[in-house]
Amino acid sequence: MDPNPRLLILLVLLAFSATVAVAEDGESTGGSKVSLGRRAGGFLHGLKKEAVVEGDHGVALDEVGPGLFDALFASLSMILVSEIGDETFIIAALMAMRHPKSIVLSGALSALYVMTVLSTGLGRIVPNLISRKHTNSAATVLYLFFGLRLLYIAWKSDPKGSQKKEMEEVEEKLESGQGKSTLRRFFGRFCTPIFLEAFILTFLAEWGDRSQIATIALATHKNAIGVAVGASLGHTVCTSLAVIGGSMLASKISQRTVATIGGVLFLGFSVSSYFYPPL
């Protein structure tokens, strides 16, 4: 029996359509695979770029790390040798003998923290107005001046003398200022009088002091955060010692010893600033 021609034609058309459908399905699958491959490649390329950027940041942080700790150590040691036995130290010690230690400590530290932030800010502004080379030269000269001045004080001072005489002078200043209390009474309505007194006396005593000028000089060519943190830690240690046992400590420490250590440290800063200037 001969097959029906119409049936054969129908079978051929069905087979052809199935083949075309399979081919189109394969092309769409392949296209989607190519698209997915491209997307995956782009994603991996982006991850690679991010990894490179993160790696660069990691290197930068590693480079900043030593500078941060170097500035912290320099400012901390500078404050320790400058403030022990200084006028701000003695003010805190004398006030703590007559007033609650916690209030005196909080008032004095508040003033010193504000002064540290101001000094560090000035140290960062100056290089934007003056070239880094000139600011580094100025810092070198300042360190040298303070170092020689402290060594001169150590040479002229009595080797057996203590800080008692300076404590008496500062106490006379405090007593002479008791009558001028109009401003204190005015601010006393808003702040604790003892806190305000400790803040004002410490702030005025620290303004223009060698530790403030040295902090500004350090901030011009060292890491500002390290300088601020180190100076704040140094002030915290010195002021706490003054409040807790300042009178006893000041009477035991020789002025010559403190001045000698401070002079050597500042001379070391001067040599370091001259031979290892910032890039």
Swiss-Prot record:
Keyword list, A-Z: Membrane, Signal, Transmembrane, Transmembrane helix
Name assigned to this protein: GDT1-like protein 3
Recorded superkingdom: Eukaryota
Membrane topology: Multi-pass membrane protein
GO annotation, biological process: calcium ion transmembrane transport; Golgi calcium ion homeostasis; Golgi calcium ion transport; manganese ion transmembrane transport
InterPro entries: GDT1-like (IPR001727)
Molecular function terms from GO: calcium ion transmembrane transporter activity; manganese ion transmembrane transporter activity
Chain segments annotated as transmembrane: 64-84, 103-123, 135-155, 186-206, 224-244, 258-278
Family note: Belongs to the GDT1 family.
Localization: Membrane
Signal peptide: 1-23
Entry keyword annotation includes Transport: no
PANTHER family hit by this protein: GDT1-LIKE PROTEIN 3, TRANSMEMBRANE PROTEIN HTP-1 RELATED
Record-level GO cellular component terms: Golgi apparatus; membrane
